[in-house]
Amino acid sequence: MGKVMLEVRDLTTKYITRFREDVYAVDHVSLKVEEGKSLGIAGESGCGKSTLALSLMGYYFPPLYYTSGEIIIDGRTISGMDPDDVRKSILGTEIAYIPQAAMNALNPTQKVIHFVEDVIRAHNPKATKKEIYELASERFHVLGLPQEVLQKYPVELSGGMKQRTVIAVSVILGPKVLIADEPSSALDVTSQKMVIKMLRDLMESGMIKSMIFITHELPLLYNVTDHIMVMYAGQIVERGSATEAVFDPLHPYSKGLMGSIIVPEAGLRDHKLTAVPGVPPNLKKPPSGCRFAERCKYVKPECKAISVGMRTLDSERTYRCIFTEGELREKYQNGA
């Protein structure tokens, strides 16, 4: 086992609505990401993926609140820290974030170099314009971006170039952990390919030490990440290698996700598309027992009464279901 860059232990965070209702969008989540490795997080919209990302970044501003658990980056515990302290001492150097709709994160009235200056001076107020420009030019060159981009306004850049620019600015200080939340959404296929290549280059060059990639597209994670974690209704329901998650999903929800999308990989091209019925539960009042029970074709009475923990198959593969591995495989084989 390699050096652990990010470890999350039993993390729980919640939203408090204006009616004082608790919504546990991240419910007892644990994970590890080793140096040089990438973790993919998949699931439908509303399953807690982006809230988990915000929680890992320490973005605890109302209505989001930290409840319990630990977040450890390269041996340093950041859970429970004041958000302002996290911003000043952690963000950018220890952990960085590429938000959803990152193309809209750039102020259209400022040149790209100004965003770089803001990031660097947050940690080094004495940095000169020359030092900042030299560092930015070097990093942009490594990532295949022209230096001229630094002197351009966002409106002068294409959508794909904006996205790659946001990524470059986010990692300018070489963070140990990069969290990319839907970084290739809303892009054409060519731009998506360039963004994915850029993220791979970041890992291979050592500019970042590890990565979490969030998306609802399991096949995309297969091409980018080493391991995949599937979330549903704020909980982890399956975790394993990228190959296992895509080609051999075990949890009924993971199986349903893979059955509802077109997969270009050889061996899966001819599978019949099937939708996952229903919608995720309302987390203001989550169901007792298995949270997927109302949508599961294999549900039995015990599923709605018993809340099961994660079953461990080996050091990398776990899943949350009342059925054993053998029982699930038999059901899938029989087409039940």
Short names for language-model regions:
Residues 66-78:
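Conserved ABC transporter NBD signature motif
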Residues 153-157, 161:
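Conserved ABC ATPase signature
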